[in-house]
Regions:
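Acidic, Ser/Thr/Gly/Pro-rich intrinsically disordered interaction regions
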Residues: 1-65, 91-94, 100-111, 129-250
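Short acidic, low-complexity segments enriched in Ser/Thr/Gly/Pro
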Residues: 83-95
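Extended HEAT/HEAT-like alpha-solenoid repeat tracts in very large eukaryotic scaffold/adaptor proteins
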Residues: 109-120
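Phosphate/anion-contacting hairpin/loop surfaces
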Residues: 123
C-alpha cells in the first residue's frame, strides 16, 4: 500500500548520498582502501564467550551504515527546520524575541542528531571490543571501551603507525564526540537541550546565532565522523593485521 511512497523516499535519500558523497563500509562491495572489510583479523586464541567476532564485525558495519543513513536524513531535512533568527516576535519596548513553534521537519531533524551520536559511539565501542580481543590481559571485558583500550595499549609502547592514528583520533575528535554523546544520550536528548538553550536566549541574538550555528552544522559534523569511522576501521584493521603478522613470526 505504501510501497510507492517508500520508494520515492528512498530515491530522495539516495540522491542525498550522491550529492553529499556519503559512503559507508558496505559500499563498493565492502572494499575500502584496498582491504576487504569483511575479512577483519581475528585472534584465534581469544575465547571470551561474551565476544563473538562475527557478530561484532556485522555490528561495526551496521553502525557505520546506519550513521550514513542518519547523516543523509540530516541533509534531507535541514533546509526545512525552524530557524530561530527568522522567527522573531516583537514585544514591549520594541524588543524582539525568538519563537519556537516546532514543525515536523525540525522534530525529526533533532531526533536524527541524537541517533547520529548513538551510532557513532556504538561504532567506536565495537572497534574497542575488536582491538581488546588482541590484548586480553589489559582489561576485563566489562571494562572495555574504545578510549580505555587505546590508553592501555599506549602504555605498551607499541610503535605502529596505524595505532598512532587511532590514538590521535581518540585524543581529539573522539573526545569531542564523546562529550556531546554523554550530554545527548546519557542525560538529555539534543532536542530537549536545544529547547532549553533557546529559552535562555530568546532576546539574545548573539546567543541564538551560536546555538543555531551548532544545530545547522551537524550534517557536516557527522559527515566528517562518517568518514572518520570508515578510516578508523581501516586503521584498526591494518593495526591488528600487523600485530597478528608480528606474532606469527615470533
Amino acid at each position: 500500500m505504501y510501497k510507492d511512497i517508500i520508494d520515492q523516499y528512498n530515491k530522495a535519500i539516495f540522491e542525498v548520498y550522491m550529492k553529499r558523497s556519503l559512503v559507508s563500509l558496505e559500499d563498493n562491495g565492502f572494499k575500502y582502501k584496498g582491504i576487504n572489510v569483511l575479512q577483519c583479523p581475528i585472534n584465534p586464541d581469544y575465547n571470551e564467550p561474551k565476544f563473538q567476532p562475527t557478530i561484532n564485525l556485522w555490528d561495526i558495519v551496521s553502525c557505520n551504515k546506519d550513521l550514513k543513513f542518519f547523516v543523509g536524513q540530516l541533509f534531507l531535512y535541514r533546509d526545512l527546520i525552524n530557524n530561530p533568527l527568522e522567527e522573531l516576535m516583537p514585544i514591549e519596548n520594541g524588543k524582539l524575541i525568538s519563537t519556537y513553534y516546532q514543525n515536523l521537519y525540525d522534530r525529526r531533524y533533532c531526533s536524527f542528531i541524537t541517533c547520529c551520536f548513538e551510532k557513532s559511539y556504538n561504532f567506536w565501542d565495537r572497534i574497542g571490543d575488536t582491538i581488546a580481543s588482541f590484548f586480553p590481559d589489559l582489561l576485563k571485558i566489562h571494562q572495555v571501551d574504545f578510549s580505555r583500550i587505546i590508553d592501555q595499549i599506549k602504555t605498551q609502547q607499541i610503535e605502529i603507525e596505524h595505532f598512532f592514528w587511532l590514538l590521535n583520533f581518540k585524543e581529539n575528535e573522539y573526545q569531542e564526540l564523546n562529550r556531546y554523546r554523554k550530554d545527548f544520550v546519557n542525560y538529555y536528548q539534543f532536542e530537549s537541550k536545544y529547547r532549553y538553550d533557546h529559552s535562555m536566549n530568546l532576546s539574545d541574538l548573539i546567543g541564538l546565532e551560536k546555538i543555531w550555528a551548532e544545530k545547522y552544522g551537524f550534517p557536516e559534523y557527522f559527515k566528517k565522523h562518517l568518514e572518520l569511522s570508515s578510516e578508523g576501521y581501516y586503521q584498526m584493521f591494518s593495526f591488528l593485521e600487523q600485530i597478528q603478522n608480528e606474532r606469527n613470526r615470533s
